[in-house]
Amino acid sequence: MMSAKDMVKVMVVMFAICFLAKSDGKPVKKRSVSEIQFMHNLGKHLSSVERVEWLRRKLQDVHNFVALGAPIAHRDGGSQRPRKKEDNVPAENHQKSLGEADKADVDVLIKAKSQ
C-alpha cells in the first residue's frame, strides 16, 4: 500500500494538473468555423430528410387510400352533389333587409359603370 505522504503527493500533483488545465468541463479545443457550419448544414439536411420522408409516407397513404377505391370527401366534409338554392340560407343574424341588399347592389353597379 501507499503511505500517507505518497498519497498526499499524488493528490497535490493531480490538483495541480486539474488547476492548470482550466477545462472546467468545457472542451479544451474550440471548434473552427467550418466545423460549426458543417454541423449546422448537417442539422438542416437531417430535418429536411425527415420532412421529405414524412411527406412521402403521407402521399403513400393517400395513394393507397385512392387505390382501394374509397371515395374522397371535400375539405368541408360535405357531399359532392351541388347544393340547392334553398340550402344556402344565411344565418338569421346576418340577414339584411331587402332594401339594404338592393341599395348595396345598386351602389356597386353605379361604381362599375362609371369606370
UniProtKB/Swiss-Prot annotation:
Proregion residues excised on maturation: 26-31
Principal cellular location given in the protein's record: secreted
Keyword Signal: yes
Subunit description: Interacts with PTH1R (via N-terminal extracellular domain).
A molecular-function term among this protein's GO annotations: peptide hormone receptor binding
Record's protein name: Parathyroid hormone
Coiled-coil spans in chain: none
One Pfam family of this chain: Parathyroid
Function per UniProt: Parathyroid hormone elevates calcium level by dissolving the salts in bone and preventing their renal excretion. Acts by binding to its receptor, PTH1R, activating G protein-coupled receptor signaling. Stimulates [1-14C]-2-deoxy-D-glucose (2DG) transport and glycogen synthesis in osteoblastic cells.
Residues of the signal peptide: 1-25
Cellular compartments per GO CC: extracellular space
Sequence segments annotated as region (Disordered): 72-106
Compartment annotation: Secreted
Segments for region (Important for receptor binding): 51-69
